[in-house]
Amino acid sequence: MTINDSVISEQGMCEEEQVARIAWFYYHDGLTQSEISDRLGLTRLKVSRLLEKGHQSGIIRVQINSRFEGCLEYETQLCRQFSLQHVRVIPGLADADVGGRLGIGAAHMLMSLLQPQQMLAIGFGEATMNTLQRLSGFISSQQIRLVTLSGGVGSYMTGIGQLNAACSVNIIPAPLRASSADIAHTLKNENCVKDVLLAAQAADVAIVGIGAVSQQDDATIIRSGYISQGEQLMIGRKGAVGDILGYFFDAKGDVVTDIKIHNELIGLPLSALKTIPVRVGVAGGENKAEAIAAAMKGGYINALVTDQDTAAAILRS
């Protein structure tokens, strides 16, 4: 959901101003939603929906000032063990939407890292799109420029489609994977593709998801149809434990050689990704622990957002 500029005739305010006023009354003045609805002449349902919209767009940010917020012990250990610049570990919660909660945590981290008019490079995947959905208001207000790290326009639309129309987004106009290495080479040398790849490498901050070979059918790269189950089995037999942007690496963090898809991908290679100053990985699930650890060992990410159980599994591995 995004905050639009529709004017509410009773108050003469745009929707974003309504959200800001409701948030102030609710969080600072301690008014109930019923009291706010009476004061503004809105239904209680409308007040509730605008509060939710404010959270999802990033206009409303909740900050918990406690040393326990973010599972400090895990964050400290991960920073020390993997030389990370930034870590956010969200507390575990049974039966919760882990992907959505990781998106909130990653959005908060990015809002603290990005400066006005900086460039954010984004990778494909559920975790990164969950994050983007919660950044709409922030991206618009801070004039953050967005650029994709890979081809595959459809893979980005669940996040980009939620952004304000005024947001600056530069998308690689090509598929994630070409049908052959020759076609991939040709596409990457087209100016319209090359220019976006150069812009992505010049980004101030990047955010990427991390896939695990152990996920099998649940892996985004399989569900999206970029590799087959048979290919994944062969990749696993070559020692791969995880991937970022479709590039597979082993438990030490080294890119696995002699994998067909690597020559057919249209996107920023991991060696170029490492030149971006801040590289945030967002991933959760104990089955991803080995892949996340390998991504940190390889230096592909230097910041991490994960959940408590996954953090514990990483530190045990």
From Swiss-Prot:
Regulation: Inactivated by phosphorylated autoinducer-2 (phospho-AI-2). Phospho-AI-2 acts by binding to LsrR, which is then unable to bind to the promoter regions, allowing the transcription of the target genes.
Keyword Transport: no
Matching InterPro entries: NagB/RpiA_transferase-like, SorC_transcr_regulators, Sugar-bd_dom_put, WH-like_DNA-bd_sf
Stored Pfam families: Sugar-bind
Keywords: Cytoplasm, DNA-binding, Repressor, Transcription, Transcription regulation
Residue ranges the UniProt entry marks as DNA-binding: 33-56
Gene Ontology cellular component list: cytoplasm
NCBIfam families, per the entry: PRK15418.1
Purpose: Transcriptional regulator that represses the expression of the lsr operon in the absence of the quorum-sensing signaling molecule autoinducer 2 (AI-2). It also represses the expression of the lsrRK operon. Acts by binding directly to the lsrA and lsrR promoter regions. In the presence of phosphorylated autoinducer-2 (phospho-AI-2), LsrR is inactivated, leading to the transcription of the genes.
Family under the similarity heading: Belongs to the SorC transcriptional regulatory family.
Xref: PANTHER family: TRANSCRIPTIONAL REGULATOR LSRR, TRANSCRIPTIONAL REGULATOR-RELATED
This protein's name: Transcriptional regulator LsrR
